[in-house]
């Protein structure tokens, strides 16, 4: 082969070899090694504080969870010993056994069924017969690489003027509770509601107390789900009547028509019920207040907001908390929708100081993101 042809052949060979190397590098860059792949909640990248951004509707469910709270829990010595993400969050018929009845009959509500009618409990749970009733997001998750981002919106005055509405609505799911007024406050708190958490007592008290401020009905919507917190027999009776589409037959709410609160849809999939054992677990491990050992012990339970936020922390991959108590709570009104500033009052049935400390510590550990000003 003469010199020019030999030189040309070597140049072509060099180009082909270089192209192959580049192609291999490009291909490997688009793949993660087994050690860095993220299968849902349990294995993910370390949590970092994040500023929620609107998700891309086309690939939202296929994105990797790059800041999963589960790994942040694993990396924190204190919270690693407190969290048990395998704890059942919701109660449904499939979990209702004689053993469960015997156990929970030894504990007062909201931690059990002491003194409650077996027939009321059993007839309520029989209506929650689908496994879907035990899943907060409906059917069991089929996409292990999806990343569920949740916002839990409390009613704290810190949200007034916050302009967080768009960021709140950008989450996959939005939890609200009690007097969840959005009309007129869309810029600050958003409009999206995926879950509404309450006890019958807090729901009805909110409708009475905040009616003049704009809370004339609880959130309603086709894709909205209601999370009952079983603080008394009233919650079981209201839940049963809501699914059956009949008036409440007895108790303080006798004659109430649930559709006036929740709308005409009566499918069992519309309603969720927190497991009393889950509430016990949350109280024992995260919110074991000194109030329990005082004369107010029988009154004490975690606040509705605390239960919703901890529910999200046990079901979502990322959690942002808005409108929850912070160290500078005295700067703000009790609620964001109040026309005049009113101080936050600490009642004996909740330990808001303990809750504030917990939210701060979870934020500092990177397990949740707490909105602060």
Swiss-Prot record:
Pfam families: Glyco_transf_29. It comes from the Eukaryota. Keywords: Disulfide bond, Glycoprotein, Glycosyltransferase, Golgi apparatus, Membrane, Signal-anchor, Transferase, Transmembrane, Transmembrane helix. CMP-N-acetyl-beta-neuraminate binds at residues 155, 178, 303, 335. Gene3D superfamilies: Glycosyl transferase family 29 (3.90.1480.20). One of its GO terms (biological process) is protein sialylation. Pathway: Protein modification; protein glycosylation. It is a single-pass type II membrane protein. GO terms for cellular component: Golgi membrane. It is an enzyme of class 2 (transferase). Its EC number is 2.4.3.3. It is found in: Golgi apparatus membrane. The keyword Transcription does not apply. InterPro entries: Glyco_trans_29, GT29-like_sf, Sialyl_trans. Belongs to the glycosyltransferase 29 family. This is Alpha-N-acetylgalactosaminide alpha-2,6-sialyltransferase 2. The lineage of its organism: Eukaryota, Metazoa, Chordata, Craniata, Vertebrata. The gene is St6galnac2.
């Amino acid at each position: 082969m003469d010199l020019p042809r030999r030189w040309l052949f070597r140049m072509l060979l060099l180009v082909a070899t270089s192209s192959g190397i580049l192609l291999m590098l490009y291909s490997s860059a688009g793949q993660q090694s087994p050690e860095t792949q993220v299968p849902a909640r349990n294995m993910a990248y370390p949590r970092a504080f994040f500023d929620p951004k609107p998700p891309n509707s086309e690939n939202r469910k296929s994105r990797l969870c790059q800041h999963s709270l589960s790994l942040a829990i694993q990396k924190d010595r204190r919270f690693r010993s407190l969290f048990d993400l395998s704890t059942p969050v919701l109660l449904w018929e499939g979990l209702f056994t004689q053993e469960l009845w015997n156990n929970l009959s030894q504990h007062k509500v909201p931690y059990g069924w002491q003194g409650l009618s077996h027939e009321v409990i059993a007839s309520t749970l029989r209506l929650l017969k689908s496994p879907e009733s035990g899943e907060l997001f409906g059917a069991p998750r089929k996409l292990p690489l999806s990343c569920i981002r949740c916002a839990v919106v409390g009613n704290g005055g810190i949200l007034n003027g916050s302009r967080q509405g768009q960021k709140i609505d950008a989450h996959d799911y939005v939890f609200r509770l009690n007097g969840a007024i959005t009309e007129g406050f869309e810029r600050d708190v958003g409009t999206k509601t995926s879950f509404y958490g309450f006890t019958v007592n807090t729901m009805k008290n909110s409708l009475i107390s905040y009616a003049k401020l704009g809370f004339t009905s609880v959130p309603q919507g086709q894709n909205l789900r209601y999370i009952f917190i079983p603080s008394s027999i009233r919650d079981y009776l209201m839940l049963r009547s809501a699914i059956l589409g009949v008036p409440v037959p007895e108790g303080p709410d006798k004659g109430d028509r649930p559709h006036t609160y929740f709308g005409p849809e009566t499918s069992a999939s519309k309603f969720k019920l927190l497991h009393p054992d889950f509430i016990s677990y949350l109280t024992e491990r995260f919110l074991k207040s000194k109030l329990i050992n005082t004369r107010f012990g029988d009154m004490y339970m975690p606040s509705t907001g605390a239960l919703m936020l901890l529910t999200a922390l046990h079901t979502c991959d990322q959690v942002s908390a808005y409108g929850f108590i912070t160290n500078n709570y005295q700067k703000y009104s009790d609620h964001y929708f109040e026309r005049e500033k009113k101080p936050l009052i600490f009642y004996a049935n909740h330990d808001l100081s303990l809750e504030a400390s917990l939210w701060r510590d979870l934020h500092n550990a990177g397990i949740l993101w707490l909105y602060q000003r």
